[in-house]
Amino acid sequence: MIVFVVNCGSSSIKYQLINMNGEKVLAKGLIERIGMDGSVLKHTPEGKYTVDINIDVPDHNFGIKLAVDALVNPDYGVIKSMSEIDAVGHRVVHGGERFSDSVLVTSDVLEGIAACAELAPLHNPPNLNGVKACMALMPQVPQVVVFDTAFHQTMPEKAYLYGLPYELYVKYGVRRYGFHGTSHKYVAQEAARMMGGEVSDYRIITCHLGNGSSVAAVKYGKSIDTSMGYTPLDGLVMGTRSGEIDPAIIPFLIVKENMDAEQIDEYLNRRSGVLGISGLSSDFRDLESAAHRGDERSQLAIDVFAYRVKKYIGAYTAAMGGVDAIVFTAGLGENSSSMREKICEGLEYLGTGIDPVKNKARGRNQEINVDGAKVKIFAIPTNEELVIARDTVNICRRIIKL
């Protein structure tokens, strides 16, 4: 079964074509600057060179057709015709409370995704555009949507409710939803496999650390808490996002800085985080280089970030009544041995620690704890596209018997 996996952003489309017989990636690609000057498709057949196609891409409909044309191109394509695509799997950021699992696309599902757009105004509309574009191009091919929020729908009320009047939850759905669910789900399953069991056997803390970062408590296969909240702004200090702050800072900014709601949103989402603390960059590679040169604020930004992650590890260990494994994933979690080491400093009380030699791992699944550790520590590259493809196959086989 061949699955076309699509992730549509506001001005981009990422895609993979995966043969699920062996879970082999046949090709992947990225279209950038949709609706802008200088748009480009970077298409990479597995094991071959990347093809750059510079062409105006006015919208997602055109972009999806361009991607499929690349897949069937006689020179750099990997299938002979579009009819070889058996199903399409889409990433959708926010499913609200309506969607607690991946689903086959119907008219009701499309309406539901649109209704959740107010919860993710930057993400759900382009996600929906991608679904509609694929439906128009391949009307007979089943479409499945996989929600970032779905994995966290197993959180209990005590974890997802805020200390606000209950009416806000009833009227507007104001609660913790959590994000990066597809990534947290994948790496928890991989960690369990590496420990020789099922994910339902273990208590695992998953740390998805990149420009956007979150931590999740996965207890016996189910998410029981996560750091992001009603929006992806909550929780950890991130690249440009503040993470959790005292809510009274917002009226303070209104009075002292004469900010309106839009300006505050910009301030907290795009000018804060390690960028705001360092005054230099949101890229941890830049911060580490500057810190090595003696830049104190860059070092401070790194320290604040690592400390917040460590706090969540401690909190989620308590919430689960213990922990069997800690997993680092995403760009920073997978690739920064120094950040993993800093976060894990002082975890000896859990009966674990980082092995400096094993911790040099990059780009592959690796156990990085000291020998004999009671709590395993892993660095695991995430693979959200594979989770989307797996869910797509499972739903298609269960519902339409493909």
Identify the meaning behind each predicted range.
Residues 299, 303-319, 323-324, 333-402:
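Internal helix-turn-beta structural module
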Residues 9, 91-93, 209, 323, ...:
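Glycine-rich beta-strand-to-loop/alpha-helix junction loops that act as flexible
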Residues 151-256:
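Glycine-rich phosphate-binding loop of actin/hexokinase-like ATP-binding domains
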Residues 219, 224-260, 266, 330-361:
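Catalytic phosphate/nucleotide-handling subdomain of diverse soluble enzymes
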Residues 266, 273-277, 284-319:
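Adenine-nucleotide phosphate-binding core of ATP-dependent small-molecule kinases
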Residues 71, 75-123, 144, 150-159:
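Short beta-strand-loop/turn "lid" adjacent to the catalytic site in phosphate-handling enzymes
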Residues 12-57:
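Short glycine-rich, Thr/Ser-proximal phosphate-binding strand/loop in the N-terminal lobe
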Residues 70-85, 193-198, 313-324:
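Phosphate/pyrophosphate-binding loops at sites that engage ATP/ADP/AMP, CoA/4′-phosphopantetheine
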